[in-house]
């Protein structure tokens, strides 16, 4: 056991106790907690341009706020964010904008989200109860370091990240910077130090250097990643390049630009020489927990991860966006982060509901107001309420609301496709490691193709059964009946498909850490990208 890591972890958890206790109390006081947050935003930002325009100073209730401030999307903030990027202030928040954090967008190639100290604090208010609850349920995690994934740079250096030398900085230097101040500094001491690897453009070099640092930490206790395939691809590289990686640990790696050297560790390399790369428990015997996305389409990827790490508990993350921290793992559920932001939810009748008005079993679209200056901002995330913790709704992510494929009027939504695949794949393709439904327009009449990677040959009935499920969408069935679409096809792809999928999105400007697992892509051309032929569904 690393005494240093243990001491720092205990200090870090001690610092989280206040946030944990406040969150526990708030679970039974949803309405006053949320109303206090909203009134605080209005009072603090009444003198801003946005606050004056919408009369923040005279708003006295949630209803008045909803009447005066319309629902918003990122497009409503573009002009303000461009001014913030140039160094202006007092536009959306009274608090100074410390940086603009890049994230992917549905209509924009990339969005820049304003981060203030208030917003950092709001993220911290969700992280504190999550981490403290985790320590209570698995105290062994406090005995050693953790790895929280970072991702390679989204753009070439000097292109957009951090390029505003006369205005507001773009991007944080590390994931722990989300917390800000001394908490971020303390959190950083508990982690395997990989922050400098974010400057690497080449994905293979990024994985190599990440693995060398992880392999050097024999006492690793926890791994936190976003996309489950981020970790499975690391594990694939671990097996494929085992000999070279052990040599790298023994000799060390030289620095490269902003990336520091990895020190030589021949003693650890001798330990690794006796380990089995296909059994991570022989490499990290005290690794007990992996945290990753586990709702929506990501749920279909968890079984493969669990097979690779049979001794490790996989904890699904809450719903976390760059803009807001929506829910967190706590007490075996995923309650709303009610101490972090003011939440609203749009129901199927287009009515705005507050957090204390939600009903179990119902589905909603998430709307947030945050300390970063986003007001009634539509995240376009669909959730369902699966229970309550105290009086606070526990939610589960269903899919992106604005991910709809519509070549001929069929209007297939990602949320619905994810539900279909979650029913079919465990029965007809139980060892699936990758699955993506996407439209193809080359070769005549367009069709949808299910690209699937599986350790076993999918059942012959998969294509026909999937076609029957898709035909339950009357628009899709109508397009097929009219000959506008061919029936769905099933194409088996190799194990590298997940990596090719991530690389295509990354080349399009997406950051690996921001890519959520998705059941449906609206992009065409995956057939060529995967380099394969596709047969009709009923021949699959």
Predicted regions: what they are:
Residues 109-110, 155, 402-405:
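A short, flexible beta-alpha/helix-coil linker loop
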Residues 101, 114-119, 150-152, 224-227, ...:
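Glycine-rich, histidine-containing beta strand-loop boundary motifs that form or position
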Residues 32, 36-100, 112, 118, ...:
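Active-site diphosphate/adenylate-binding microenvironment
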Residues 100-114, 234, 490:
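Conserved adenylation A10 loop of the ANL superfamily
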Residues 134-185:
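Active-site cavity-forming subdomains of large catalytic enzyme subunits
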Residues 1-52, 57, 65, 69, ...:
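Active-site glycine/GP-rich loop and adjacent strand/helix microenvironment
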Residues 98-102, 323-326:
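Contiguous, well-ordered alpha-helical segments that form the cores/surfaces of helical PPI scaffolds
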Residues 108-114, 147, 159, 165, ...:
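Conserved small-residue
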